[in-house]
């Protein structure tokens, strides 16, 4: 058998994640050769437009998925939060790796935490989810769109009049930047994106050999938690550029799921907390409770201008 080709985006963080998967596989299968195949995705190439305006189906995944379907690569490593809830026909997730810290973090230019920033301070983020929740927490803040990899965002913070930037804790920790974190943002203030902090490995469905190999990387508690979150997102027909947050944790047999839908200005935030044993069912039930509070109306208001 030849080498196993692992597809990945070519950013430093994506390469870290793919290298982590590669090292794990080398530990389990020392007799096999594993090689990384870096690729650029559409989302990596278009950096001057906010994500919400590009549309988000497979923005950071499509090129890798084409590689899976045409046999160019054997598996693809993704940040789970970038993977749409509906995968292209013929593809599946073979492993949900153990989740890193799912919260968001604030990196302040001068060490001032979010709650103490002066009115009018500018926060760098392109995420509608982060903006909406921050506006709900502090309506006196301003925002600047911020795209690019983590190194680019950090550089832009230093070179601009932004007071700070909001990033996913997992990526910051994986790059060894813990000393740059001013604070971890409480989930009471900011619920994270669906699947945030988890690495997923995608394969072509007919590749039973690769599925079996990746089974050792799958983390059961992470799988159950993120499946509940993804079921909520699917039921709400949300994409990763819509202000929907979810965070599930497993406690013995139970899964506790928190869900959130926000209006763009953060004036309306709907929340739900629900527990159950079955991930997909729990996600659907939590979404239905949000729908009963008016979630679909909020989401339609957001989608209409984005679709024009």
Swiss-Prot record:
GO terms for cellular component: cytoplasm
Pathway: Porphyrin-containing compound metabolism; protoporphyrin-IX biosynthesis; coproporphyrinogen-III from 5-aminolevulinate: step 2/4
Residue list for modification S-(dipyrrolylmethanemethyl)cysteine: 240
Keyword annotations: Porphyrin biosynthesis, Transferase
Co-factor: note: Binds 1 dipyrromethane group covalently.
A Gene Ontology molecular function term of the record: hydroxymethylbilane synthase activity
Cofactor (UniProt): dipyrromethane
Biological process according to GO: protoporphyrinogen IX biosynthetic process
EC number: 2.5.1.61
Catalytic activity field: 4 porphobilinogen + H2O = hydroxymethylbilane + 4 NH4(+)
Superkingdom field: Bacteria
Enzyme class: transferase
HAMAP family: Porphobil_deam
Family statement: Belongs to the HMBS family.
Miscellaneous comment: The porphobilinogen subunits are added to the dipyrromethane group.
Job description of the protein: Tetrapolymerization of the monopyrrole PBG into the hydroxymethylbilane pre-uroporphyrinogen in several discrete steps.
Subunit structure: Monomer.
Protein name: Porphobilinogen deaminase
Lineage start: Bacteria, Bacillati, Bacillota, Clostridia, Eubacteriales
Name of the gene: hemC
